[in-house]
UniProtKB/Swiss-Prot annotation:
The species this protein was found in: Spiroplasma citri
Alphabetically ordered keywords of this record: Ribonucleoprotein, Ribosomal protein, RNA-binding, rRNA-binding
Name of the protein in question: Large ribosomal subunit protein uL6
Gene3D superfamilies per the UniProt record, alphabetical: Ribosomal protein L6, alpha-beta domain
UniProt record similarity statement: Belongs to the universal ribosomal protein uL6 family.
One of the record's GO cellular component terms: cytosolic large ribosomal subunit
InterPro entries, A to Z: Ribosomal_uL6-like, Ribosomal_uL6-like_a/b-dom_sf, Ribosomal_uL6_a/b-dom, Ribosomal_uL6_bac-type, Ribosomal_uL6_CS
Gene: rplF
Keyword Ribonucleoprotein: yes
Entry-linked SUPFAM superfamilies: Ribosomal protein L6 (SSF56053)
Oligomeric and partner information: Part of the 50S ribosomal subunit.
One annotated GO biological process: cytoplasmic translation
Pfam families in the record: Ribosomal_L6
Job of this protein: This protein binds to the 23S rRNA, and is important in its secondary structure. It is located near the subunit interface in the base of the L7/L12 stalk, and near the tRNA binding site of the peptidyltransferase center.
Length: 179
């Protein structure tokens, strides 16, 4: 029995949840999100609560049950509050700049790295070494932050690279001199 799938999700005030045969649409203050629902999962919204049920007890149905419930919870939170990921850039000469709808990163390569910002995402730079990724879709915010981090992951010796704000990098000791 999926405990996550059986959760009742409270609909915050000011949000509108529309359920179609294979779709759930959530409209809120920050925008609108849409999620396709598999045929084995049934979503019901009434009296300010969203519930999900599955048609059978096949393993795949059980897996989808919890996943869809969590995705809908993320949608409810996203259109009401939004999501935010913060990244930090460490390293001499490493910095970021916004040029139109592109994020330009100087990360020690022979050329600047340009990242096109997708629709529905806002990126702000309080400092040239700090990037804030914001949006209503939890999946998209996480994906954009991961893509930016992948351009130069933090290395274990000096910690240079792009890391999440509260990420702890396990450091290694360098080569020791001869005896």
């Amino acid at each position: 029995m999926s405990r996550i799938g059986n959760r009742e999700l409270k609909i915050p005030v000011g949000l509108e949840v529309t359920i179609q045969p294979n779709n759930v649409i959530v409209k809120g203050v920050k925008g609108q999100l849409e999620q396709t629902i598999p045929s084995v999962i049934t979503v019901v919204a009434k009296e300010g609560v969203v519930t999900t049920t599955r048609a059978n007890d096949v393993k795949h149905s059980k897996q989808l049950h919890g996943t869809i419930n969590s995705l809908i919870q993320g949608m409810l939170e996203g259109v009401s509050k939004g999501f935010k990921k913060e990244l930090e850039i460490n390293g001499v000469g490493y910095r970021a700049a916004l040029v139109g709808d592109k994020l330009t990163l100087s990360l020690g390569y022979s050329h600047p790295v340009e990242y096109k910002i997708p629709q529905g995402i806002t990126i702000t730079l309080p400092k040239p070494t700090q990037i804030i990724v914001e949006g209503i879709s939890k999946q998209l915010v996480g994906e954009v932050a991961a893509n930016i981090r992948n351009y130069r992951k933090p290395e274990p010796y000096k910690g240079k690279g792009v890391k999440y704000k509260n990420e702890h990098i396990i450091r290694k000791e360098g080569k020791s001199a001869g005896k």
